[in-house]
Amino acid sequence: TVHPRPDERHIRPDDVTALSRLLKAWLGREFNIEGNPFMNLMEHVRNVRPDQATFVPDSLAQKTSDHGCDLKKDGAAFEKVVAEAKALGVRVSLFMDPEPENMKLAKDVGADRIELYTESYAATRGTGAAAAELTRFAESAQAAHEAGLGVNAGHDLSLANLEELLVACRYIDEVSILSL
């Protein structure tokens, strides 16, 4: 997974192309590009046609992602970029807050998967709020599965908190882990 940002602090455009070529030579390896589809991400998706594109609604000013897609407000715009990516043969995942009622909206705009934004789970682990937060994630994963979506998860995950999340959210297909 790479997250090319307009400020190029994580990866440069040439790196995206080079990494795509490298991974295509390794059968069975997937290439996921994540970022804001309304900035520069779609140019990369068109150029390299990754296995998966994860649409994250971050802004230029953000140091890191801090919220999921607001499909109630921006659903029509996401529907267009999802359709474009899928027409290129790219699986699409939408970065989503753990709100079970919004999982069907991701399916309605054409997404194949959602990625649960797990920062709130990681932040509450070991506190009195942890059980309720874990339940919210489990319900969101269940709702996504019932809507016919694959489920990814990521943000502030580590070996210290991953197992508990995977046990509670049995439908998770893929995780992005920050540290071991």
Region spans (language model):
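Alpha-helix-loop-beta-strand connector modules within alpha/beta enzyme cores
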Residues: R9-G35, L71-S93, A129-A153
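Hydrophobic, well-structured mid-protein blocks that either form specific transmembrane helices
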Residues: A53-D112
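Catalytic cores of alpha/beta
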Residues: F38-R49, P98-V109, A153, L157-I172
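Glycine-rich phosphate-binding active-site loops on the catalytic face of alpha/beta enzymes
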Residues: H3, T54-Q62, R113-R125, R170-L180
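Structural preference for beta-strand elements that scaffold enzyme active sites
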Residues: T1, G28-N32, Q52-T54, G89-F95, ...
